[in-house]
Each structure stands twice: as C-alpha cells, then as structure tokens.
C-alpha cells in the first residue's frame, strides 16, 4: 500500500473496508490515493477501526478524527458518518472481557476541551464512511479545520467574516458572505471562555 495499486484494480469496487490497516502503512498520502483509485464513482470507503488515543506503538500513527473530516471534505467526498468510540481492549487484565463501548458522533471542534489528556486511560478509535461523488479527488492537501476555525475567529473579531456551513468549505462558498454584529461575536467569545472553566466532559 506504500505503492500505487495495479491499474487493473482501479475503479473496480463499490466499497473498500479499511479495518485497522492505515496505521501500519508509512505513506499515508499514497494510501488515500489508492483508496480513491480503487473505489468507483458513487462507491464508499469505510474506516472501521482507525486507532486514536492510547494506541502507543501499535502502528506508525494514531489518528485524530479531524484527519478524515478535513481530507475528505477538501477533496470533495461526501461524508456519510463520523463517530469516535471509547473502549477497553478485549483482553483486559488477563481476562477476555469488554465493557460496553461508548459511541459518539464527531463534529469538528467537539473534542477541543479534551485535546490534551482529556481521555485518561480510555482508548479511542474512529469510524468514518465517505462516498466518492462526481469530481472527488485525492490530491488536495487539507488545511486542518482547527486552524480554519481559529482563522475565522480572528476574522470575526475584525467584524466581517465569510459564513461557512463547514470549517473546511469549498471555494465556491466564499461567494456567500455575511456580516455578524460585533456584540454577538463578543458574547460568543465570553461564552467560550466560561465553558473552559467548567469540568471537562464528552459531547
């Protein structure tokens, strides 16, 4: 998977299910290019068990959900589902055992309060489904949506901002401009500051 897939496999599949392989392959851009090549238009890529928090040395990488959201959004795919789930491993303290998994829907920014040490001992993994729609690509480099939100917040402080429905919006959305009253921006800013003082909890 570090190399391009053979041409005879390109566009042959309506679904590619990736269940914990991504983290073991060094060249991630090539893997995403391969997924794009394998799936026919209208087909789906499913990431079924992408390791996130507390998977040290399991593979080359642990993934933030923003990777999948930002990559597929930037490349014009339609994201059907994004979830993150907490779990203890099946083999736990010498016993084959698993407590119920806590599964939550992911939206950009929902984990900001937990970004640094907020999950404790819990393991977290990801589930993502993306559809290859007409015009979708795999070669656009995404801007991390965290910094897109930060940049938009700075623009709001100046008074006039683009109104996007998504932190990583298509270029065409720039045409949809709007202004936000300054007092509403300040109110939102203070609400965010107060929220940081509250105990951390999952959405």
Where in the sequence are the language-model features?
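Residue-level detector of flexible, active-site-proximal loop/helix-junction positions
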Residues: 3, 84-89
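Short beta-strand segments enriched in hydrophobic/aromatic residues
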Residues: 49-51, 86, 134
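Conserved Class I S-adenosyl-L-methionine
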Residues: 58-85, 93-103
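Flexible, glycine-/basic-rich loop-and-beta segments that form/coincide
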Residues: 89-168
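Membrane-proximal basic amphipathic "stem/tether" segments
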Residues: 152-203
């Amino acid at each position: 998977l570090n190399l391009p897939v053979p041409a005879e496999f390109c566009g042959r599949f309506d679904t590619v299910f990736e269940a914990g392989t991504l983290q073991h392959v060094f060249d991630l851009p090539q893997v995403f290019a391969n997924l794009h090549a394998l799936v026919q238009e209208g087909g789906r890529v499913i990431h079924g068990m992408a390791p996130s928090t507390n998977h040290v040395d399991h593979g080359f990488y642990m993934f933030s959900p923003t990777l999948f959201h930002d990559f597929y959004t930037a490349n014009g795919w339609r994201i059907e589902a994004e979830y993150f789930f907490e779990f203890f491993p099946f083999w736990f303290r010498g016993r084959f055992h698993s407590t119920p998994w806590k599964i939550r829907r992911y939206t950009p920014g929902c984990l900001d309060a937990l970004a640094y040490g907020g999950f404790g001992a819990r393991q977290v993994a990801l589930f993502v489904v993306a559809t290859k729609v007409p015009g979708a690509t795999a070669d656009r480099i995404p801007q991390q949506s965290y910094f897109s939100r930060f940049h938009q917040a700075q623009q709001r402080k100046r008074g006039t901002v683009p109104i996007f429905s998504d932190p990583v919006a298509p270029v065409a959305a720039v045409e949809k401009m709007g202004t936000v009253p300054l007092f509403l921006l300040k109110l939102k800013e203070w609400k965010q500051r107060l929220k940081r003082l509250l105990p951390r909890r999952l959405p």
